Amino acid sequence: MSTEQSVTEKQETQVGFGSALGTGSLLMTLAGIAFIGYGIIFLVLNFIGGGFELGVSHLAGQTPADLDPTVAYYISHLHVATAGFIISTGIAVTALSWFGVRRRQLWAWTTAVVVAVSGLIIALPMHYMGGFAHDWVTHLGPIYLAVIVFVVGVVLAYKGL
C-alpha cells in the first residue's frame, strides 16, 4: 500500500497558510489586489486630480488645464485605458494566484508571473529615459512595493508547488 498521494489528491489537498505555497500564493494574491488598487487610484485621479497622473503634477511647467482641451482629453483617454489594463492585470494575478497557485497549478503560477512581468517590462523603462520629471515615490513607489510582495510570493509559492 502506497502512502504517496496522486497528483490529483495533492492538488486537492488544502494548502495551509503556514506553508511556503500558502504564504506565497497569499502574497501573490495581495500583490494582485494592490495592482487593482493602484489602477483604481490611477483612474480616479484622472477625473479628480490636478496633475497629469499620480506623482506627475506638471510637464514642462504646464498642468493639464494649460493644454488645448483636445490634447488634454486625448491624454485623459490614454490614462483611462492604462488604468483599465492595470486593473485587468491585477484581476488576472489575483484570480490565478488564489484559485490556481493555491491549488498547486503550475500553469496558473506561470501565467500570473508572465502577466505581471510582461506589463512591468513594457511600462517601467519609459520612466527612466528622462522624458519628464516625476516624483518616483508617489508615481512608482506603490507599484514597486506591490512588485516586491509579488516576487517574494512567487519564490515562496514555487518552492511549495
Q: Language-model features: where?
A:
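Topology signature of small-to-medium multi-pass alpha-helical membrane proteins
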Residues: 2-161
